[in-house]
Amino acid sequence: NHLTTSLGITAQYFTLNKNWTVEPRAALKWTFNPKHALALAYGLHSRRERLDYYFVEQEVNGKTESNRYLNFSKAHHFGLTYDWNINSYMHLKVEPYYQYLFRIPVEENSSFSIINHQSFYLERILKNRGSGVNYGIDITLEQYMKNGFYYMITASLFKSRYKAGDHIWRNTRLDKNYLLNVLAGKEWMVGRNKQNVLSLNGRIFFQGGDRYTPVD
């Protein structure tokens, strides 16, 4: 029965526009039983966009505007983890999480947000006025190799939404809602001296589809 604490801090400085950020991180783990543990984590994370985005310029109402002074996108990450060592060869992990994204680059009076951008080129003037949320739960059940058999099942249920420059909340492009992955295998020792391995492995994967805007 013991507590473990981790503290950290990181910083970034972008010389192009002289923006900087300081990001604290913290984690607390409570092992309250040899087989059970709970962990709570928080982190502030920042992201710089692709360099070419900062050099986009456009003429707006007779004035030249650019993305040169875009700030870092930021996100508060909160996570809770429950670990259960069921026995010497089975393990269960449950991880609910919540992420709040802010200062996201968006186009004013538009549904465009950098969160959904997937094209190689960008020709829009952006402002750090968007936001978003991601929340869900990840579950992993794993059996390590025993009697030549192993498996790992991972499942995720989640929601991903964003608010763009028109102040309307929408589902993000990657809001698939669910993921399920099943991996399993069996090994047999074969040959006269049982020194060779014959293995059979398989994987099944399901996920929800990407969001898209229908063409009228």
Task: Indicate residue ranges for each PLM-predicted region.
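Feature marks flexible
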Residues: 1, 32, 45, 67-68, ...
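Short sequence motifs at beta-strands and strand-loop junctions characteristic
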Residues: 1, 16-20, 69-74, 129-133, ...
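Hydrophobic, lipid-facing positions within transmembrane beta-strands of outer-membrane proteins
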Residues: 1, 7-9, 22-26, 38, ...
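Surface-exposed extracellular loop regions of Gram-negative outer-membrane beta-barrel proteins
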Residues: 1-15, 21-25, 35-78, 98-124, 141-143, 147-159, 203-216
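Repeated loop/turn-to-beta-strand initiation elements of outer-membrane beta-barrel proteins
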Residues: 2-5, 35-38, 88-92, 147-151, ...
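Transmembrane beta-barrel strand/turn architecture of Gram-negative outer membrane proteins
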Residues: 9-11, 19-35, 84, 154, ...
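Gram-negative outer-membrane beta-barrel transporters
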Residues: 98-100, 121-210
